[in-house]
Each structure stands twice: as structure tokens, then as C-alpha cells.
């Protein structure tokens, strides 16, 4: 699972997901990409599940880049615990996603294979996504 090696503060506030991302909205490495169309939180397990789904489909054909990293800790209290007594301990890590953020990139495969691999990956994610390519970016 993806998680930071070391953080300054163990626990964070929930925060807000409004607005657009400051960076990470254009393709930087590959030819094709999977772009988020709405905001949400992606868990480290969901990021890994989508990566495995893509790798299984393209086999050894191309290269995949993960453009996101879960750096926000989620806390949880133990089961059957009464309310109060402070905030729970860090449980998992999430990545805050805003609309337009590139989640994954891919190259070394045809567009049809990339589309299908990203479709399989999108089924593992809790947010709606769309396929994007360098060709689309230059035309629009």
C-alpha cells in the first residue's frame, strides 16, 4: 500500500474539496491518461486495485505511471467504542482528488488497449473518470 514514510502531524482535519487542482491536470509522462471528473477521496487500496487491474490487462505491453499519492491520514475509533475520549488513531491513507486531476498515465500500447485498461481501472475507483490523450489535448 502507498503511504508516506514520515509526516509532520499524525492526524489531520477533514478539509474541503472545493475548487480545481493547482497542478496535475495535464499529461506529463505517457500518451494516454485517466482523468477525474468529480472530487473525492481515493484510498491507497483503491489506487493499488486500479493499478493491478490495468497491469493484468496490458500484461507486459506498456508502462504505467501513478500520478497521485495518498498523503492524508484518515482516523478511526475501534469498534464498539463509546463516543468521546478524543480522536481515533490513524487508520488509512487517502488522496484528495479534485476535478481534472490526472490519476494514471500510460504509454507503449495502442489507444484501444489503453481505453480498455482504463475502463477496468475506473470500475475500481469511487469517482467518475474520463479517458484523455495527448492527441485530444493538442486538438482542443
Curated annotation (Swiss-Prot):
GO terms for molecular function: rRNA binding; structural constituent of ribosome; tRNA binding. One of its GO terms (cellular component) is cytosolic large ribosomal subunit. SUPFAM superfamilies: Ribosomal protein L16p/L10e. GO terms for biological process: translation. InterPro entries: Ribosomal_uL16, Ribosomal_uL16_bact-type, Ribosomal_uL16_CS, Ribosomal_uL16_dom, Ribosomal_uL16_sf. It comes from the Bacteria. Keywords: Ribonucleoprotein, Ribosomal protein, RNA-binding, rRNA-binding, tRNA-binding. Belongs to the universal ribosomal protein uL16 family. Binds 23S rRNA and is also seen to make contacts with the A and possibly P site tRNAs. Part of the 50S ribosomal subunit. This is Large ribosomal subunit protein uL16.
Amino acid at each position: 500500500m502507498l503511504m508516506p514514510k514520515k509526516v509532520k502531524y499524525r492526524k489531520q482535519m477533514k478539509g474541503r474539496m472545493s475548487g480545481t487542482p493547482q497542478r496535475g491536470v495535464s499529461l506529463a509522462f505517457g500518451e494516454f491518461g485517466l482523468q477525474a471528473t468529480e472530487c473525492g477521496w481515493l484510498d491507497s487500496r483503491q489506487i493499488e486495485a486500479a493499478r493491478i487491474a490495468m497491469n493484468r490487462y496490458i500484461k507486459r505491453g506498456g508502462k504505467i505511471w501513478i500520478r497521485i499519492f495518498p498523503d492524508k491520514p484518515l482516523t478511526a475509533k475501534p469498534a464498539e467504542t463509546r463516543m468521546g475520549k478524543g480522536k481515533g488513531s490513524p487508520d488509512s491513507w487517502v488522496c484528495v482528488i479534485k476535478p481534472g486531476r490526472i490519476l494514471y498515465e500510460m504509454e507503449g500500447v495502442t489507444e484501444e488497449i489503453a481505453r480498455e485498461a482504463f475502463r477496468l481501472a475506473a470500475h475500481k475507483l469511487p469517482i467518475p473518470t474520463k479517458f484523455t490523450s495527448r492527441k485530444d489535448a493538442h486538438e482542443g
